[in-house]
């Protein structure tokens, strides 16, 4: 079994910085490439943001993040007790629309899947 790192935070947007810092420091300790680590920080930030905004909807709750590495695989678990949703219910964003014209949000699930 590889090394394991755990973090638990309250489901508040102001805790996203701590989550990103945790992913970065855990990844660095585990020898993850900096470019890959930057992508992982963005993806985990998007996932936790979705949990906070759409899962807990402002209610109290916790988000637990675990980072493990076993052989060649890095695994990140995000655990919560929020309301569930199906990612298949989320529309694919209009990528041809410029960032200036695009509505705020709506990219999280796309980034996570891709």
Predicted regions span which residues?
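Helix-loop-beta hinge of the Bergerat
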Residues: 2-34
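Conserved polar catalytic motif of the HATPase_c/GHKL fold
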Residues: 46-50
